[in-house]
Amino acid sequence: MKIYFSCSLTGGRADEKIYGVIVDDLLAQGHEVLTAHLARPEVMAEEQRISPREVYERDIQWLKEADALIAEVSTPSHGVGYEIAFVLLQGKPALCCYRAGARVSKMITGNNLPNLTVRAYGDEGEALKVVQQFLESSSQPPPGQTRSLD
């Protein structure tokens, strides 16, 4: 599956470790993570080498190519919100996962679109379980129904 992984860059990198854990697990399962570089510590230096326009055009193309979006939303980010909305409007499945206790926008937690799954996790193992359940449910999205991972 082609996955667009979304996470905070300019909003803060406090959750960088879990970004890497999620992306590494996706890659190990054989998924193509179009944005795997976002989980790496050197991403900020890499992203400074290209213009905002180039980032926008590249990322929009990746969003169009992706089968699904997985966003780690513990750290607020304008870009992540934009990417989530873009994918949802395309009707593609999206997962927004976050650290239990993190303050997440009600525009995310209150959204009941059938192609959006929002889940908190307590630790790395639970985060990976949430992602795996999402991937399993996304392989055959139920038309017109809210996804349940319980």
Where are the model-predicted features located?
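Conserved catalytic or regulatory cores that recognize and/or transform ribose-phosphate-containing ligands
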Residues: 1-150
